[in-house]
Amino acid sequence: MFHLLIYPLWVLVALFAVIIANLLYQQLPRRPDEPPLVFHWFPFFGNAVAYGLDPCGFFEKCREKHGDVFTFILFGRKIVACLGVDGNDFVLNSRLQDANAEEVYGPLTIPVFGSDVVYDCPNSKLMEQKKFVKFGLTQKALESHVQLIEREVLDYVETDPSFSGRTSTIDVPKAMAEITIFTASRSLQGEEVRRKLTAEFAALYHDLDLGFRPVNFLFPWLPLPHNRKRDAAHIKMREVYMDIINDRRKGGIRTEDGTDMIANLMGCTYKNGQPVPDKEIAHMMITLLMAGQHSSSSASSWIVLHLASSPDITEELYQEQLVNLSVNGALPPLQYSDLDKLPLLQNVVKETLRVHSSIHSILRKVKRPMQVPNSPYTITTDKVIMASPTVTAMSEEYFENAKTWNPHRWDNRAKEEVDTEDVIDYGYGAVSKGTKSPYLPFGAGRHRCIGEKFAYVNLGVIVATLVRNFRLSTIDGRPGVPETDYTSLFSRPAQPAFIRWERRKKI
């Protein structure tokens, strides 16, 4: 019997010794140029639980104790958080030779997006790829997207069983995930791709999305069930796009004039003279679909949930359309120019992106020692630096009652000024560095999201269309929205999240 107990006992003793050694190590004097280390009980795992359950709360507590710059341990990695507007600027505008995103995000994204695109290619090539896909984000393209998006929303609410009858309930995150994949595919990718968005294709998208689980930051190639589904889905989805491309190469299908992304990419050439290979076109299309859907799905869900919690805002949005857009008492189909006539709608989108950013942490791998401005700290190459624009967006320093969702806070707030001299071209067009603003819902620097204008158009049209057709309320009639689910790479409302809808009378 003693022999059966001795081995577990030794394991416990060894574990206890490791914990004690870790605690003693944290008490040792640190070099003055090293950022303070956040306390943690267990080596390797470090602060993973506290950070994973509530990253924003974790940042807030650490900031109170250590200031804007501190180190925490995340599964063996030393993460140096650089918070505040200065921290955002330091991380997001870091020079490519000092810090890069590829080493952090490559292992996670390559199995999902595919090879030779985004983080599986030199940064200069990524900048060219971003320039190629801006074809679908021009002013002319955005104007053409509006009625396509509106039609997709109307088709969904007219045909989906969840919207049958005069009133019922609906699981908001589920519905908005479906609506946004339809709007993103139809507007950014074209009618041909949209037609292929059958239930089978949607299932492939879901399986591919499983690849964005946080565990895949560390173990992207583990033969876990969700990774096997991810890999199979990527192959099948790539085949869908390759079939379209091959048919077009043979001249069998006519492209849509001016709005078809596949046709655009088929005609693009890199600076070295090489046409974009068909495989890379397919991988860019997968990337574009997922990038266009993820943030819109989360943001639109939060908007609808807040509108259900605040029916007065919903009615203000409806009246705003009646006052500014109605013709002879009726609301005509939306046009791009209509969005500028709906300031409250824009403020609802803006406020939701402030309170509910889908990405709370932005990481870069340090390649050369970096001196943190206005501090004694030097960050060495064994570390990863991290910015969190969410921290400034939710700070009382910049926004009164920052944790309260209040679209009217933007009514009299001067538009964030952009220094026209602080502009840089990373290879895909001139953009503002923008990192001195406390409000950065689309990031900043060379990896700033190029789909900002599309996101505002997509969200604005979706919300305007829903408000035209429905009154919204919470199930029990009391205000409130769900907690945030941080278990995925992209923050989103905890599911399920049901609300009640009531169809408006036609005017």
Swiss-Prot record:
Catalysed reactions listed for this entry = a 14alpha-methyl steroid + 3 reduced [NADPH--hemoprotein reductase] + 3 O2 = a Delta(14) steroid + formate + 3 oxidized [NADPH--hemoprotein reductase] + 4 H2O + 4 H(+); a 14alpha-methyl steroid + reduced [NADPH--hemoprotein reductase] + O2 = a 14alpha-hydroxymethyl steroid + oxidized [NADPH--hemoprotein reductase] + H2O + H(+); a 14alpha-hydroxymethyl steroid + reduced [NADPH--hemoprotein reductase] + O2 = a 14alpha-formyl steroid + oxidized [NADPH--hemoprotein reductase] + 2 H2O + H(+); a 14alpha-formyl steroid + reduced [NADPH--hemoprotein reductase] + O2 = a Delta(14) steroid + formate + oxidized [NADPH--hemoprotein reductase] + H2O + 2 H(+)
One annotated Gene Ontology cellular component of this protein: endoplasmic reticulum membrane
Q: In which pathway does it act?
A: Steroid metabolism; ergosterol biosynthesis
Record: residues binding lanosterol: Y105
Q: What happens when the gene is disrupted?
A: Decreases the amounts of 4,4-dimethylergosta-8,14,24(28)-trienol, the product of the Fusarium sterol 14-alpha demethylases. Leads to reduced ability to produce conidia. Results in high sensitivity to triadimefon and antifungal azoles such as propiconazole. Affects ergosterol production in the presence of ebuconazole or triadimefon. Host-induced gene silencing of the 3 genes encoding sterol C14-alpha-demethylase leads to strong resistance of host to Fusarium species.
The cofactors it requires, by name, are: heme
Task: List, alphabetically, the SUPFAM superfamilies matched.
Answer: Cytochrome P450 (SSF48264)
The subcellular localization recorded is: Endoplasmic reticulum membrane
Signal peptide location = none
Q: Which UniProt keywords apply?
A: Endoplasmic reticulum, Heme, Iron, Lipid biosynthesis, Lipid metabolism, Membrane, Metal-binding, Monooxygenase, Oxidoreductase, Steroid biosynthesis, Steroid metabolism, Sterol biosynthesis, Sterol metabolism, Transmembrane, Transmembrane helix
Can you tell me where the transmembrane regions are? 7-29
Q: Which residues make up the binding site for heme? A: C449
Taking the record's annotation, the residue ranges forming a coiled coil are none
Q: Tell me the enzyme class.
A: oxidoreductase
Gene3D superfamilies reported in the protein's UniProt record: Cytochrome P450
Name one molecular function that GO assigns to this entry. oxidoreductase activity, acting on paired donors, with incorporation or reduction of molecular oxygen
Q: Keyword Endoplasmic reticulum: yes or no?
A: yes
Membrane topology reported for the UniProt record: Single-pass membrane protein
Instruction: Please report what switches on or represses expression of this protein.
Output: Expression is induced by azole antifungals such as prochloraz, tebuconazole or epoxiconazole. Expression is positively regulated by the FgSR transcription factor that targets gene promoters containing 2 conserved CGAA repeat sequences.
Under the heading InterPro entries, the entry gives: CYP450_sterol_14alpha_dmase, Cyt_P450, Cyt_P450_CS, Cyt_P450_E_grp-IV, Cyt_P450_sf
Q: PROSITE patterns this protein is in?
A: CYTOCHROME_P450
As for what it does, the entry says: Together with cyp51B and cyp51C, encodes the sterol 14alpha-demethylase that plays a critical role in the third module of ergosterol biosynthesis pathway, being ergosterol the major sterol component in fungal membranes that participates in a variety of functions. CYP51A encodes the sterol 14-alpha-demethylase induced on ergosterol depletion and is responsible for the intrinsic variation in azole sensitivity. The third module or late pathway involves the ergosterol synthesis itself through consecutive reactions that mainly occur in the endoplasmic reticulum (ER) membrane.
* PANTHER family linked to this entry: 24-HYDROXYCHOLESTEROL 7-ALPHA-HYDROXYLASE (PTHR24304:SF2), CYTOCHROME P450 FAMILY 7 (PTHR24304)
Q: What else is known?
A: In Fusarium, the biosynthesis pathway of the sterol precursors leading to the prevalent sterol ergosterol differs from yeast. The ringsystem of lanosterol in S.cerevisiae is firstly demethylised in three enzymatic steps leading to the intermediate zymosterol and secondly a methyl group is added to zymosterol by the sterol 24-C-methyltransferase to form fecosterol. In Fusarium, lanosterol is firstly transmethylated by the sterol 24-C-methyltransferase leading to the intermediate eburicol and secondly demethylated in three steps to form fecosterol.
This protein is called what? Sterol 14-alpha demethylase CYP51A
Q: Which gene encodes it?
A: CYP51A
